[in-house]
């Protein structure tokens, strides 16, 4: 997957597409179909995963790959700090809509939409017994996970830490929020997302879905 990502970085073609959400045309960046199939397979792998939000499922898949590449073993003691800016917004919007329409909520509404369920489910999947931390600090959430893990490692309270972030914000409500803030990219721009263009004269935010995880540990 890393090779595919690097290949896309080198390509002059954008993966940003226009999709319709509740009748509104929005610019978004989605995960590849192959990864979508992996998420669907993960849902079926364990009956408990069926009700989880995509932020959790993507984080689990990314964590499995990171741990395998680092050579960590199932059951190893390591800390986990995976954050999310928007959290389980897909499930939250689904459950809220059901509540508005029926006046009732599903049993799993609370446990599957609380922010802490990302790191705890990763710990469950990897059978880790170390500390589990979740947080939300907007766009710098994943970076703060790295900073927090470094503090744990340097303090001697941990020797290994799994860190990162996961976002699945492509929902009508979340996209509408960004539009309301007037920070979203316009379709008539030549390059819609210009995050590193310090001379741009228009806002150029584009939401995407992704999970990124890294393994940090003390050196010898």
PLM-predicted stretches and their roles:
Residues 1-48, 219-220:
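ACP-dependent fatty acid/polyketide chain-elongation machinery
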Residues 104-106, 147, 151, 168-220:
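Glycine-/small-residue-rich "gating" segment that lines the acyl/pantetheine channel
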Residues 76-83:
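Short glycine-rich phosphate-binding loop at a beta-alpha junction
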Residues 2, 91-95, 172-177:
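Short acidic, glycine/serine/threonine-rich loops at helix termini
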Residues 59-69, 115-118, 123-126, 131-167, ...:
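Active-site-proximal alpha-helical scaffold in enzymes
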Residues 42-52, 107-108, 132-135, 198-204:
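A short glycine/serine-rich beta->alpha loop
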Residues 84-133, 180-181:
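Active-site-proximal gating segment of KS-fold condensing enzymes and close homologs
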């Amino acid at each position: 997957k890393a090779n595919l990502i690097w290949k896309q970085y080198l390509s002059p073609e954008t993966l940003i597409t226009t999709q319709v959400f509740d009748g509104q045309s929005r610019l978004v960046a989605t995960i590849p179909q192959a990864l979508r199939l992996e998420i669907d397979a993960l849902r079926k792998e364990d009956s408990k995963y069926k009700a989880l939000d995509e932020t959790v499922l993507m984080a689990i898949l990314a964590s499995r790959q990171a741990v395998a590449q680092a050579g960590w073993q199932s059951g190893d003691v390591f800390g986990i700090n995976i954050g999310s800016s928007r959290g389980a917004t897909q499930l939250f919007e689904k459950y809220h809509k059901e509540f508005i329409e029926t006046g009732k909520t599903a049993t799993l509404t609370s446990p599957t939409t609380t922010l802490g369920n990302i790191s705890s489910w990763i710990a469950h999947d990897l059978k880790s017994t170390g500390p589990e931390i979740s947080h939300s600090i907007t766009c710098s959430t994943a970076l703060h996970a790295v900073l927090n893990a470094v503090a744990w490692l340097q303090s001697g309270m941990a020797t290994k830490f799994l860190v990162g972030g996961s976002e699945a914000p492509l929902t009508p409500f979340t996209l509408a929020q960004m539009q309301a803030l007037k920070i979203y990219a316009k379709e008539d721009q030549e390059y819609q997302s210009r995050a590193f263009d310090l001379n741009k004269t228009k806002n150029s935010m584009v939401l995407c879905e992704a999970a990124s995880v890294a393994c940090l540990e003390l050196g010898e």
